[in-house]
Amino acid sequence: MPTSFYDVVVLGTRLEPLLCAALLAREGLRVLVLGQGVPEPSYSLAGVEIEPYGLTMAGAQSPIVQSTLEELALRQDVRQRMADRANVVQLLLPEHRLDVYPEADRWLAELGREFPGVRRQATDITRTLAEVRSEFDTVVARGLVWPPETFLERQRFSLTATAQRFDRQGQGWTSWNQLAVRHPLRTAFEAVLPHLSGLVPSQHSDSTRARLHAHVLSGVSDLSGGWSWFQEALFARIRSWGGDVRPRDRADSIRHDGRRGHSIHLARTDEEIGCSQIAHGTAIGELSQLLPERGSMATMFERVGEPRARAYRCSVHFLVEKRGIPDALGPLALRCMSETDPNQVFVLRSRDVESNRMLLSASRLVEEHLVDTGSSPLHFVREEALDAIRGVVPFFDEHAIWVDSPHDGLPPRAFRADTELPCSDPWARGPSTMRAVYDYPTRRALGVCALTTRTPVRGVFLCNEQVAPGLGLEGSFLTATSVAKIIGSQYRRRDWLRRGPWAQRSV
C-alpha cells in the first residue's frame, strides 16, 4: 500500500523535469521530484568547483524562455547573473578569428575585415536570419504544445505555423547556403549546432539550423553560478510552492493501477508512493526499464522510431595562471581545428577562479564508435584538448597548473609535480558518465521535436531533452511548458467542476 500520495511525480533533476515540476507546483499541485540517479552538477578539485556540462544561455531572448522565467519569478535573477560582455562568442578558425557581436553593423564590419569577399552574401544572410527569428518568435509565443498530437493541437499548430517559410518538416531556406560548401565561415556555423542543441549537424532541419544561427547572432551568454545555481533556484521554487525534492532517491519500478493512478517504489527507502501523473525526465531507455511490461513502449517506437546514441559529450578542464591567457581570448569561443570539417571542434570556456588563476574548459563530441562506456579509458580526449588549446594559447604548458578530464577514466594530474590529485565523487567518473547525443529516425513540428510527450502508458509523460532536441535551451523550455500544460489542463477541468456552477446544484 502507498504510504503517501502526490498529484505528480517527476523523475530526474535536469532542466526539463525541474522546469515542469516548478510550473506544476506553482499551479497548486502536490509535486514530488526524485533525483533518479542524475549526478551532481559540479564536483570539487583542489578547492575549485567544476561543472562538466555548462549551461549555455543560447536563446534566452525567446518569448517562451522569458515568459516561463517570469512565471517562476526568476527572470530578474537570471538577468542579473547573465554574463555581460561586448562580444558574444568567438570563432577561432585556423587562419581567421571573428568576434560575433549582437549589433549587426559591428558583426558585418568584423566579417568585412576577415572575409571581404563574402560581405554582400553575409549581409543578406544576417538580414534573413533576423526575419526568421521574428517569424519563429510569433509561433513560440502562442503557447502551443510541442509536438502537437491531438486533433485540436495539430490544428492550432498548423494555423499558427502557416506564415512560416518552412514546411511541416522544417525544410525551406537554408542558413549560410549561399557560401561555398567548404567555406570556413559556413564550417564554423555548422560546427556550433551540436553544442547548442541535442542533434548532430546532419539531423538538423533548415528551420532549426536558422533558429540556432539567429540565436548565435543575437547573443549567447553564461550564467554566473552556472547550472548549479539554476538547479538550486528551481529546487527553492518547488519547495516554496509546497512541492518536495529528493535528489538522492530514485524509483526502481512503476506500477500502473488503472484509473486509480500509479504507484512507484523507491530503491533506497523501500517506500511505495502513489500518484496520478508521472513526468519522466531521463532517457527514454530508462523509462522502459521501470515499467512492468517493457513492450508497452513498442507502439511508440513503431510510430516515431527508437533513438540510438550517435556521439557523446566530454570535457577537459585546466587550471592555469591568468597571466598566461591572452587578453584576446574571450570567455566563450569555438575552436575549429579544420576549415572544412565541422566535426573537429572544441568549445572553450574560461572563468576567473582567483585573482591570478583561471579555469579553462574544453568540451567536444566523441563519435560513438570511439567510445566504450563500460571499460577502457579514453587517452586521446585529453591529448587532443591540449593540442587545441596550445594552438591559441602560446606557452600554455609553462602556465598550466593541473588538468582533469572526468569522462575519460584518467585521474587528474598536476603538470609541474606530475602527480595525481584527489577529487570529490571519484565514483562518478569515467566514460559511462558522458551524455549521449542521439540519432532520431523521425522528426516533427518544423523539425524541432523527435519524441512525443505522451507515452503509451496512460498518465506517464516524457519530459526530457529527447522531446525537442532541435533547439537546445529553447527546446527544453518548450518541452517543460508543454508537459505542464497537458497535466495542468486535466486538473483545471476538475477544479472547474468542483468550484463552478455544478457544485452549487443539489439533487
Language-model features and meaning:
Residues 2-137:
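N-terminal glycine-rich phosphate/pyrophosphate-binding loop and immediately adjacent elements
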Residues 130-241, 248:
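Active-site/ligand-binding neighborhood in enzyme catalytic cores
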Residues 186-199, 395-469:
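A glycine-rich dinucleotide-binding beta-alpha-beta segment and adjacent secondary-structure elements
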Residues 489-507:
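Active-site-proximal substrate-binding core of FAD-dependent oxidoreductases
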Residues 321-418:
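C-terminal segments that line or cap access tunnels to active or ligand-binding sites in enzymes
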Residues 465-488:
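A conserved FAD-binding loop/helix module that cradles the flavin
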Residues 35, 231, 247-249, 255:
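Short loop/edge segments at beta-strand edges and connector loops
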Residues 217, 222-223, 252-356, 454:
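Mid-domain catalytic core of redox enzymes
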